[in-house]
Regions:
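Active-site beta-loop-alpha junctions enriched in small/polar residues
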Residues: 8-9, 80, 110-111, 144, ...
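Feature marks short, surface-exposed loop/turn motifs that line or immediately flank catalytic pockets
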Residues: 9-12, 43-44, 239
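Cys-nucleophile CN-hydrolase/nitrilase-fold catalytic domain and related Cys-dependent amidase chemistry
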Residues: 15, 23-101, 171-172, 176-191
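Active-site catalytic loop in hydrolytic enzyme cores
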Residues: 87-159, 171-180, 242-249
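C-terminal beta-strand edge segments of enzyme domains
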Residues: 107, 131, 198-259
């Protein structure tokens, strides 16, 4: 599977402009099977969401559906969303959607809300671990702060996966943690890890990017930093399976999480 990661300079609460920027980056990387956008890619990381936030997110949602069909590819990215449960509490859900070329929609709700930044005041946390099938690849979707909590991303025999996707709005002030933790998740789970961060500035933070694809050995296949950019690489499932068979670390792992 060819995966393409989009490091967008996200315009604050401006879906039309962010769609234009995503279109431009996608055009530079044709023929991918899966395109991945950052966290809250069409609004920016909005910890005080309102009706305008939802309106912009709906525009992003509809565009992802159309674009997946147009490109005959899957498209992933998170949006500030509302569900029946969140509406009852007046909150939103930070939701990672994966749109398929056939019109299918899978989703994951962010489990670990960023209390330091106030996300927990306006969002509901998800409680469900989700593994999605994208082509031949089993994908575990995760969102930003989830990266700091490895138990929920443990690769298990009961619910295994091949690729973790982390979509993020991860500030430059904590860039080292981003770089190190992505490698750790790949090594400890013997899987590919796609870390897709935004670039640019919002009301509070500067973002350097650091978007990367890491193989099961912990090697970065590419790294984007310092500008809006897009890059692609292949997920080699045969190479990953051979490594797991030769060096079967996961069978000796502690059982913390069976979900």
């Amino acid at each position: 599977m060819k995966i393409s990661l989009l490091q967008i300079d996200v315009a604050w609460r401006d879906a039309r402009e962010n769609i234009r920027r995503a279109e431009s980056l996608m055009a530079s990387q044709p023929c991918a099977d899966l395109y991945v956008l950052p966290e809250m890619w069409c609004t920016g990381f909005d910890v005080s969401p309102d009706g305008h936030t939802l309106e912009q997110s709906k525009m992003g949602y509809e565009w992802m559906l159309r674009k997946a069909e147009e490109l005959n590819a899957s498209i992933a990215g998170s949006l500030a969303w509302q569900t029946e449960a969140s509406l009852r509490s007046g909150r939103f859900v930070n939701t990672l959607f994966v749109m398929g070329p056939d019109g299918s929609v899978c989703h994951y709700a962010k489990r670990h809300l960023f209390g330091y930044g106030g996300e927990d005041a306006h969002y509901l946390s998800g409680q469900q671990r989700v593994v999605m099938q994208v082509g031949d690849v089993r994908v575990l979707p995760q969102i930003c702060y989830d990266l700091r909590f490895p138990v929920a991303s443990r690769n298990t025999a009961e619910n295994p996966y091949d690729l973790i996707i982390y979509v993020a709005s991860w500030p430059a002030s904590r860039q080292t943690a981003w770089d190190v933790l992505l490698r750790a998740r790949a090594i400890e789970n013997q899987c590919y890890v796609a870390g897709v961060n935004r670039f640019g500035d919002d009301l509070h933070c500067h973002y350097e990017g650091g978007t990367t694809l890491i193989d099961p050995y912990g090697n970065s296949l590419f790294s984007l930093r310092g500008s809006a950019a897009c890059a692609s690489a292949e997920i080699d499932l045969q190479k990953m399976r051979q490594f797991r068979e030769k060096f079967p670390v996961l069978k000796d792992a502690d059982v913390f999480y069976k979900g």
